[in-house]
Amino acid sequence: MLSRVSQVSRVGFSLARASSTARVWVDKNTRVIGQGITGKNGTFHTQQAIEYGTKMVGGVNPKKAGTTHLGLPIFASVEEAKKATNADATVIYVPPSGAAGAILEAVAAEIPLIVCITEGIPQHDMLRVKDIMKSQNKSRLIGPNCPGIIKPEECKIGIMPGYIHKKGKIGIVSRSGTLTYEAVHQTTMYGLGQSTVVGIGGDPFNGTNFIDCLERFTNDPQTEGIVMIGEIGGTAEEDAAEWLKQYGNPNKPVVSFIAGRTAPPGRRMGHAGAIISGGKGTAKAKMEALTSAGVKVVETPAMIGEAMFNMMKAAGKA
């Protein structure tokens, strides 16, 4: 696989850019292909996406090229699939050993949005992927080790349960998959709904961070409030707090929860990136940084929906 990674890293990138109507990367017009959709997990979640209304337009499997699966044409390569379907997004269900190669194949084909669900990709492989991603500007990676992205009632790319989502006004970004679903459920129950929900994943080396999502949500007219779910490890939340201080919209309230307050230093808590190291990455530091940026930081995930509703009500938006 690493030889394949090296090969893709030498691919040049043209100035052509696929057009998209999406404000936060996906909408009803997003055309999606799948890598690894003929496997058990890929088949299940692709079927769910089709039933949700996502425009799935094809799949990639070199060994099954020329056949169909779930009514979708299967192609030998991502490049071939893009040319035939005009896809502007791909979802990756490839096992860990081949996932980095799958990401880089999509980068080489200049797919605008790459969503990698796969968990357990070797960090060495992701370091290489991240380095290559920085050298181009045609593709965006969400993940890996994430639930994906969904614009309720329009497009679902990933493994999240579609039925708990409701079209609405809250943008949600999270490092945790299950806590994402909790925030979705609560904002649905309070009648706020969601504009777009992005699971950025819990690995140390991911493609899309909090700031990327905050920037999109801040500039998205449909998004009127933001929920941000972080966890211990790294400095992504502190960086997001600094961004909010400079560029945040005071008319778009932000609620946050940080998981892992009781975690001991040096012990990984679930995600590969959820570890306090060298005195950095503590929940306390993250909560203080976000609070100083005007974010309402809640003590438990059970308070996310209520806090968001109260802030929206105070702003005359609920």
UniProtKB/Swiss-Prot annotation:
Q: What is this protein called?
A: Succinate--CoA ligase [ADP-forming] subunit alpha
Q: Which domain of life is it from?
A: Eukaryota
> What reaction gets catalysed by this protein?
succinate + ATP + CoA = succinyl-CoA + ADP + phosphate
Query: What HAMAP family is this protein classified in?
Result: Succ_CoA_alpha (MF_01988)
Molecular function terms, GO-annotated: nucleotide binding; succinate-CoA ligase (ADP-forming) activity; succinate-CoA ligase (GDP-forming) activity
What binding partners and quaternary form does the record give?
A: Heterodimer of an alpha and a beta subunit.
Family the entry assigns: Belongs to the succinate/malate CoA ligase alpha subunit family.
Organism source for this protein? Blastocystis sp. subtype 1 (strain ATCC 50177 / NandII)
Q: Where is the transit peptide?
A: 1-18
What EC number(s) does the entry state? 6.2.1.5
